[in-house]
């Protein structure tokens, strides 16, 4: 059995088991698949499990190897609470599990994006919406609703629109409910999307060159990389038998070191031959390590199974990726544990929103919030239970109505806690434990930072 087929079989078996468990047990935030004394296979430590309904802290320390070895990551997190919020996704998700612990048995389990925030909204020449499905899984719908709500509050705060935040959340939840009630709902792209697309290049050489600049040295001979990549090319021969045999031949490969929440994950960019031997029709692929999610206790699919993000993106995306596949690298290749990766095409034009520069007016943010609400409202129940899809959507609508006050309170509380945790993180970093003298000067003077807050260009807080 090939690694790809084995992954499909494992995902099917886990999905069936998860369904049976939901019938037999009410999941609680206190449960975990990790036994006492064991650690999850993750580059970051798992958050403490909540006890007696106590929410885990959102505070992390800047005095760690994660930041000393990644000074650029530290700088991005210090820029404002939203960057910090992006980095602590596992801690944040577990905090939401804890807050809704007593209600989890009655909250539908859905296709969960599991890292919903505004800077994961991207525009391409083919589509728009939340992308980057590394954390996607099956779990309670409130995780996406609360996380995106906090992202909107932090974005309003950064732009000086705090008085608009609650209205943004209302728009998001209203659009979410509308999509649940009407699974055929479509809305036009927000005006921001059209403005960004107007700046896209149609010159392939320029687009390919820009992607190639992101490739950093592999650190190993390309031949070693190609040996593992063959797993993926074998899958593509089955999925796309009409493509020429050389379509996925590697022309250039490199490490990819961008992002905040995924900054510590292993990622690669590849330039492959494409449909002809002409450079202009080359294709860019991204290879990303599949995240281990065992630090989040109330979701159902926690292990790093490569088919998890592949299936979830097909259900959640407005426009699913092309050329999706997987690679499994065994311990014998020098890793401490088996590593799994998923692969997909990168578009020529790919623009992620920025909370500081993408929204010129509150209406811009309002429109994106509504668009994400529709995307999640359509994607959350998709293919979960086709024979009972109408009943599932109705249950989801009633759940949001029943828990709306609790959801809004969780958004408000976790926004405050995230900001407070970021201030503590920043104070500790500036005290000298994580920053050298030059970096301290940069954050205190060059950016105009004035503890405890960073003023934004629009007069709001960071």
Language-model segments: residues:
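N-terminal secretory signal peptides that target proteins for export/translocation
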Residues: 1-10
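Bacterial N-terminal signal peptides
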Residues: 13-27
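Signal peptide processing junction and immediate N-terminal pro/mature segment
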Residues: 24-40
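Conserved ATP-binding subdomain of kinase catalytic cores across diverse folds
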Residues: 37-66, 79, 83-113, 118-195, ...
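Sequence-structural signature of the catalytic-core scaffold of metal-dependent phosphohydrolases
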Residues: 182-235
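Short N-terminal edge-element motif at the start of the domain
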Residues: 232-247
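Acidic, carboxylate-rich catalytic segments that either coordinate divalent cations
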Residues: 407-456
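Long, low-complexity, intrinsically disordered segments
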Residues: 457-462
């Amino acid at each position: 059995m090939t690694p790809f087929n084995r992954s499909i079989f494992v995902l099917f078996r886990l999905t069936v088991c998860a369904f049976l468990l939901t019938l037999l047990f009410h999941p609680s935030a206190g449960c975990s698949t990790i036994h006492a004394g064991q650690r999850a296979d993750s580059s970051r430590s798992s958050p403490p499990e909540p006890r007696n309904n106590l929410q885990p802290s959102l505070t992390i320390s800047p005095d760690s190897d994660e930041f000393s070895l990644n000074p650029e990551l530290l700088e991005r997190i210090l820029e404002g609470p939203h960057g910090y919020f992006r980095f602590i996704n596992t801690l944040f998700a577990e905090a939401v599990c804890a807050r809704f612990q007593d209600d989890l048995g009655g909250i539908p389990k859905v296709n969960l994006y599991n890292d919903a925030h505004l800077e994961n909204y991207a525009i391409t020449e083919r589509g728009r919406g939340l992308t980057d499905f590394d954390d996607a899984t099956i779990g309670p719908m409130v995780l996406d609703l609360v996380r995106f709500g906090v992202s909107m509050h932090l974005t309003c705060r950064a732009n000086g629109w705090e008085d608009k935040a609650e209205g943004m959340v209302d728009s998001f939840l209203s659009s979410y409910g509308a999509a649940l009630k009407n699974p055929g709902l479509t809305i036009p792209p927000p005006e921001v999307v059209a403005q960004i697309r107007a700046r896209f290049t149609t010159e392939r050489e320029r687009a390919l060159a820009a992607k190639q600049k992101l490739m950093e040295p592999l650190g190993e001979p390309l031949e070693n990389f190609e040996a593992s990549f063959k797993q993926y090319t074998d899958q593509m021969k089955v999925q796309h038998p009409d493509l020429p045999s050389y379509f996925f031949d590697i022309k250039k490969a490199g490490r990819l070191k961008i992002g905040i929440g995924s900054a510590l994950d292993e990622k690669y960019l590849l330039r492959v031959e494409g449909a002809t031997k002409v450079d202009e029709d080359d294709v860019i692929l991204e290879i990303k390590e599949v995240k281990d999610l065992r630090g989040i206790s109330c979701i159902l699919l926690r292990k790093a199974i490569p088919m998890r993000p592949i299936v979830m993106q097909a259900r959640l995306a407005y426009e699913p990726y092309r050329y999706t596949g997987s690679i499994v690298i065994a311990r014998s290749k020098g890793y401490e544990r088996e590593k799994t990766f998923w692969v997909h095409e990168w578009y020529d034009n790919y623009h992620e929103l920025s909370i500081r520069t993408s929204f010129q007016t509150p209406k811009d943010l309002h429109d994106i919030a509504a668009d994400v609400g529709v995307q999640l409202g359509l994607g959350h129940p998709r293919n979960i239970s086709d024979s009972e899809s109408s009943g599932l959507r109705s249950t989801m609508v009633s759940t949001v109505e029943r828990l709306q006050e609790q959801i809004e309170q969780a958004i408000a509380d976790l926004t405050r806690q995230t900001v407070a945790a970021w201030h503590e993180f920043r104070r500790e970093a500036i005290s000298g434990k994580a920053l050298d003298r030059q970096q301290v000067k940069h954050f205190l003077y060059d950016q105009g930072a004035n503890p405890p807050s960073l003023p934004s260009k629009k007069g709001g807080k960071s």
